[in-house]
Amino acid sequence: MSYYAFEGLIPVVHPTAFVHPSAVLIGDVIVGAGVYIGPLASLRGDYGRLIVQAGANIQDGCIMHGYCDTDTIVGENGHIGHGAILHGCVIGRDALVGMNSVIMDGAVIGEESIVAAMSFVKAGFHGEKRQLLMGTPARAVRSVSDDELHWKRLNTKEYQDLVGRCHASLHETQPLRQMEENRPRLQGTTDVTPKR
């Protein structure tokens, strides 16, 4: 794992969290219990404090950064999709930020909200609870349905379970030269399926 002290501040990672070895955590970063930090994620706490609360996930290639004297926060059970950028913002409890979305400084995403993939949330945006946000710039298009929130929570549970699975079995290896016969398929831990 790539952890770096910066001006005397050392990242804090709860022992039950999983941080992929290729992720980079610098300086003032606080990672809570059961958090998943994916491959190539960059959490740069060299200006403002970065806080990832319990049960949240920061997926592959995500970037977190912020200005001095501000906290960039992912709330409890927050779900940050592949390639998203969070800069000086607050993601509410149980909210989802879709793949490759950008959330700018001072923006607040409300609890149980969903930001659609590829959305751009402008600086200073203040969302409400349970909004579906989409577009460039993003705007609230409607409320998140019970089914959508259930789907989000199943996906987050998959990542919470992945923490333990990674601690138990993820290790560096060499590739096989060919696929073995009857190669098994990986199974999830919930009945989540892609949203169509």
Curated annotation (Swiss-Prot):
Region annotated Disordered, chain positions: 173-196
Gene Ontology terms describing biological process: carnitine metabolic process
Keyword Flavoprotein assigned: no
Keyword Repeat: yes
Listed InterPro entries: CaiE, Hexapep, Transf_Hexapept/Carb_Anhydrase, Trimer_LpxA-like_sf
Superkingdom assignment: Bacteria
Pathway per the UniProt entry: Amine and polyamine metabolism; carnitine metabolism
GO molecular function, one term: transferase activity
Biased composition (Polar residues): 187-196
Swiss-Prot/TrEMBL keywords: Repeat, Transferase
Protein family membership: Belongs to the transferase hexapeptide repeat family.
Job of this protein: Overproduction of CaiE stimulates the activity of CaiB and CaiD.
Protein name, UniProt field: Carnitine operon protein CaiE
Record organism: Escherichia coli O139:H28 (strain E24377A / ETEC)
Gene symbol of the encoding locus: caiE
